[in-house]
Every structure is written in C-alpha cells, then in structure tokens.
Amino acid sequence: WQYRLPGEDGKLGTTQIININDNNPFGINLDDPYGKDDVLIQSDVINLETNQPVKILLRSVDVLHNWYVPQFRAKMDAVPGIVTYYWFEPNKIGEYEVLCAEYCGVGHYAMRGGVEVQSTEDYKNWISEQETFKDLIAKQEILELENKKLAKNNNFLLRKEIYKEE
C-alpha cells in the first residue's frame, strides 16, 4: 500500500497513470502546482487524525484489490483504470489492520497494512515529518547532479588511463 495526502493547500494534485515510474510512484503531474506539496507515504501504515472526515481515493496499477479495515466497517475495491472512493470518520484513537479482501495473486497474503488513528497534536507532528512531492523532486535533482559529476569524473579518469597506456 502507498498513500498520498493533500499538503498545506488542502488539495491533491492531479495524476496520470502514464507518469508513474520509479521517480514518480504516484504519477503526479509535474506541471500541477497543487501536487508539489502533496505528502507521499510510501509505507504500509497511514496515520489519520481522529474525528476528521477522510475521503479515500483508491486505484490499482495492476489487478483488482480491496482496501478493508474491519473495525471501520470500510471496504472498497481498487480497480485498475478506475478511481473508487468512500468517506469515513475515524473516531477512536488506536492501531487498526488494513487487509486486501480481494484475492489478487500470489502476493495476496502479504497485502497487509495499518491505520494509526492519532490525536490532533500527534497527527500534526507526524505529518510535519513526512516527505512531499517537492522534496522528492529536489532529492532526484541532487542525485542527477551527483551522477553527472561522477560520470564526468569517470570519463576524465578513463581518458587519463587511455593516454597513460599509449
């Protein structure tokens, strides 16, 4: 499971399946200003604030799945190519198990996760520590610069070795 939450602007950025890759696991549109502050949770556990309504948008990139939290009486299919959703409001602080309630293949048994419902203060502390899409882009730009420097240095060293042997 992976999760994306709206950032400070309160709006999720738009996404497209064609944008999904290792550098953009959620497929967020790079040109959408609302996506820059989206909070990215690449973990099996999502934290939620108690007594706040939550709208879950579900999508799948491979096969049919089902996000199920028995204690919330919440169960919804995640269908490839379709966004499904439902609303709920967690009202009891605690930890709850997320299950995939749709047989989805050989890895089905491992499709477990968690929901941690927290007080407002704990949730705000947790959310402030999470990575945003803007942070992810910045990290990738730094890595690209470092890779270019390494490639340039390796090319220089390689040329130096070639000239040395002649």
Describe each region flagged by the PLM.
Residues 1-166:
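Non-transmembrane, membrane-proximal soluble domains of secreted or membrane proteins
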